[in-house]
C-alpha cells in the first residue's frame, strides 16, 4: 500500500502540467521539478509579409493539444557594433558577458511573438498568485525571453512564502519593432514592439487565471530597454492602462530606464534612419519604400539593419530604433506626459546602477580633448543651443576625478574624456532621468534604489546591466533587492515585507529631508540621499527636449 502511494505521488509530481485557455484550448507544459513551465506559446500572428512592421494581430489558430516545452526563437536581432572587448580588463569583460544584454540572441526569426508562463510546482487554476511580467532589455536592438530564465526567482518566491507566477513576452526589436519615419506614422504602425508587449499583457489578462495567476495582481518589470518599456506603458494612452474595463497591471518596477528622450516618430532622425534602411535594402528609389521593405527577404532586411548605427556605435545612445511619440498612444514627449500627470496611477520602484554610462562610453574613445568632447555633444544633441552645450560642459567638467566610474579619482580614465562622456550618457539616459520622474510623479507610492556594488571594478565600475547577474544568480546584497524586495513588492506592494534588515524609505522628492534611496554596495544595504550632481540635473533637464535624440 505504501509503495503504491509513493509511486502515485511520484507520478503526480512528474506529470506534465496542463492549462485550459480562455478559448477552450488545452495546452501542455513542462514539469521541471522545481517549477512548471509553458514556453513559446504564440500570442500573435507571425508578423511577416504584409504584417512586417505593422501592429500585432492576436493569434487566431488552435493550440488545443499542443505541447509548449521550449522557448520560441527570439525576434530578429541587430548585431551591436563596437570593440569594447579590446578596451576592458578580463574581470569587467566577464561580468559584461554574464549580463547577456549586449549581445544578439539566437536562434532568431521574424515569427517570434510568443509568451512564457513559469509557475511553482503544483500550481492550479484558482491559486490566484501574483504575476510578474518581465520585459527584457537590449537597447531596443537585441534580446529575447530565453536569455532570462526565471527559475531562481520562482524558487526564491517559494522560499519566502510569497510564490509568484513569472511571465515573459517576446517583442520585435530594432527595425522590425521600432522603425520610425513619415511613412510609419501615416500608416499608424509606430512603436510596434511596444504594441507586441501590450498585446502580451492582454493575453495575460485573458488567460493567466488558467495557470493559477491573478490578473488583478500583475506587476510589469524590466531592465534597460525593458525598464523604459515599462515607463512607456505607464504613459501609454495618457495613462489609461485598462483592458476590458480592468487595469492590465497594478504596479511597475524599472531597473535602469525611465522616460525615453526621443523626438517624434516623424522627426528628422527617424526619417534619416528610415531612408538609410531603405537605401541599404535596395528600396531607396522605390515609389513606396515601406512596401518595398516589406517585400525584401528576411536576410536582406537583416543585412540592411546591421548597416544602420547600433548602440555600440560612435553615436551610442542616439539610437536608430527606439520608442517615439506618435501622437496616438504616446501622445506627447514623455517628459511632458510625466509633468502633466498623464500616467497610470500605480506604485513603482525605479532604480539605477551608479555608472550607467561607462559601457556606452567605450564607443567614443577617439574623443580626447575638450574641443572634441564639445563637438561630440553637439552632434549627439542637435537641438541643444551653444549656450546649453556650454552649460553641460561646465556641469560635467573634464576633471577626470568627477567623471564615471564615479568616486574613483584619477583611475579608470581610458582617455581624458572617457569619464566625462560616460557621466553625461549615464545621467541623461538613466540615473538623473529617474530623478526627474520621481520629482514629478504623484501617481502612487514610490521607492528608488542606487547600486554601487561593483565600485571597484576596473574601467566600468557599477555598470549598466550588471544587476541582471545578481538577479539571475542570487549573488550578493543586490540580490536582496532584485529578488526578495521585488517579489515582496509584487505580492504586497511594499518591498519592506521582504524582511530586509534596512527599511526601504518611500521617495517623496529629491529634496525631502530624510533619506530617500535604498543604497546597495558590496557590504550590504543602507539608505542615502538622491541629491548628487544637481548641476548636471539642471543642465540636462531644465529643458528636456534640448537633449532629445
From Swiss-Prot:
CDD domains named in the record: Esterase_lipase
Matches recorded under Pfam families: COesterase (PF00135)
Residues linked to a glycan: 329, 366
E.C. number(s) listed in UniProt: 3.1.1.3
Family the entry assigns: Belongs to the type-B carboxylesterase/lipase family.
Catalysis: reaction(s): a triacylglycerol + H2O = a diacylglycerol + a fatty acid + H(+)
Organism name: Diutina rugosa
Gene label: LIP1
Catalytic residues of the enzyme: 224 (acyl-ester intermediate), 356 (charge relay system), 464 (charge relay system)
UniProt keyword annotation of Hydrolase present: yes
UniProt-listed PANTHER family: CARBOXYLESTERASE
Protein name: Lipase 1
Disulfide feature: 75-112, 283-292
GO molecular function annotation: triacylglycerol lipase activity
Amino acid at each position: 500500500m505504501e509503495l503504491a502511494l509513493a509511486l502515485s505521488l511520484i507520478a503526480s509530481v512528474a506529470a506534465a502540467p496542463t492549462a485550459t485557455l480562455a478559448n477552450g484550448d488545452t495546452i501542455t507544459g513542462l514539469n521541471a521539478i522545481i517549477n512548471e513551465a509553458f514556453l513559446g506559446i504564440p500570442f500573435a500572428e507571425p508578423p511577416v509579409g504584409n504584417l512586417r512592421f505593422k501592429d500585432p494581430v492576436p493569434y487566431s489558430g488552435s493550440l488545443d493539444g499542443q505541447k509548449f516545452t521550449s522557448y520560441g526563437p527570439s525576434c530578429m536581432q541587430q548585431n551591436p557594433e563596437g570593440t569594447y572587448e579590446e578596451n576592458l580588463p578580463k574581470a569587467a569583460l566577464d561580468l559584461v558577458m554574464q549580463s547577456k544584454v549586449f549581445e544578439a540572441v539566437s536562434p532568431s526569426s521574424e515569427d517570434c511573438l510568443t509568451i512564457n508562463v513559469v509557475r511553482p510546482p503544483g500550481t492550479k487554476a484558482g491559486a490566484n498568485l501574483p504575476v510578474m511580467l518581465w520585459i527584457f532589455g537590449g537597447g531596443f536592438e537585441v534580446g529575447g525571453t530565453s536569455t532570462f530564465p526565471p527559475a531562481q526567482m520562482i524558487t526564491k518566491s517559494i522560499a519566502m512564502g510569497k510564490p509568484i507566477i513569472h511571465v515573459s513576452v517576446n517583442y520585435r526589436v530594432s527595425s522590425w519593432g521600432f522603425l520610425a519615419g513619415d511613412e510609419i506614422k501615416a500608416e499608424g504602425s509606430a512603436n510596434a514592439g511596444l504594441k507586441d508587449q501590450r498585446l502580451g499583457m492582454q493575453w495575460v489578462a485573458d488567460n493567466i487565471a488558467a495557470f493559477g495567476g491573478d490578473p488583478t495582481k500583475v506587476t510589469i518589470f524590466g531592465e534597460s530597454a525593458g525598464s523604459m518599456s515599462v515607463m512607456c506603458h505607464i504613459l501609454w494612452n495618457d495613462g489609461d492602462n485598462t483592458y476590458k474595463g480592468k487595469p492590465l497591471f497594478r504596479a511597475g518596477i524599472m531597473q535602469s530606464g525611465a522616460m525615453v528622450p526621443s523626438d517624434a516618430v516623424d522627426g528628422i532622425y527617424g526619417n534619416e534612419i528610415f531612408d538609410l534602411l531603405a537605401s541599404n535594402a535596395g528600396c531607396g528609389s522605390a515609389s513606396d519604400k515601406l512596401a518595398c521593405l516589406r517585400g525584401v527577404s528576411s536576410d536582406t532586411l537583416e543585412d540592411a539593419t546591421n548597416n544602420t548605427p547600433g548602440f555600440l556605435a560612435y553615436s551610442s545612445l542616439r539610437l536608430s530604433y527606439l520608442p517615439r511619440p506618435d501622437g496616438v498612444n504616446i501622445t506627447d514627449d514623455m517628459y511632458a506626459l510625466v509633468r502633466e500627470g498623464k500616467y497610470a496611477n500605480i506604485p513603482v520602484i525605479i532604480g539605477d546602477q551608479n555608472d550607467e554610462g561607462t559601457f556606452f562610453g567605450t564607443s567614443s574613445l577617439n574623443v580626447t580633448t575638450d574641443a572634441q568632447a564639445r563637438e561630440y555633444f553637439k552632434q549627439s544633441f542637435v537641438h541643444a543651443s551653444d549656450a546649453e552645450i556650454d552649460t553641460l560642459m561646465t556641469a560635467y567638467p573634464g576633471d577626470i576625478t568627477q567623471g564615471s566610474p564615479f568616486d574613483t579619482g584619477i583611475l579608470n580614465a581610458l582617455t581624458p574624456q572617457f569619464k566625462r562622456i560616460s557621466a553625461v550618457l549615464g545621467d541623461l539616459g538613466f540615473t538623473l532621468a529617474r530623478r526627474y520622474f520621481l520629482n514629478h510623479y504623484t501617481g502612487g507610492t514610490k521607492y528608488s534604489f542606487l547600486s554601487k556594488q561593483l565600485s571597484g571594478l576596473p574601467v566600468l565600475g557599477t555598470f549598466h546591466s550588471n544587476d541582471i547577474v545578481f538577479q539571475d544568480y542570487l549573488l550578493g546584497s543586490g540580490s536582496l533587492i532584485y529578488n526578495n524586495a521585488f517579489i515582496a513588492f509584487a505580492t504586497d506592494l511594499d518591498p519592506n515585507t521582504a524582511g530586509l534588515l534596512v527599511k526601504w524609505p518611500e521617495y517623496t522628492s529629491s529634496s525631502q529631508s530624510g533619506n530617500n534611496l535604498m543604497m546597495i554596495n558590496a557590504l550590504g544595504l543602507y539608505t542615502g540621499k538622491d541629491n548628487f550632481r544637481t548641476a548636471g540635473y539642471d543642465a540636462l533637464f531644465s529643458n528636456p527636449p534640448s537633449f532629445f535624440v
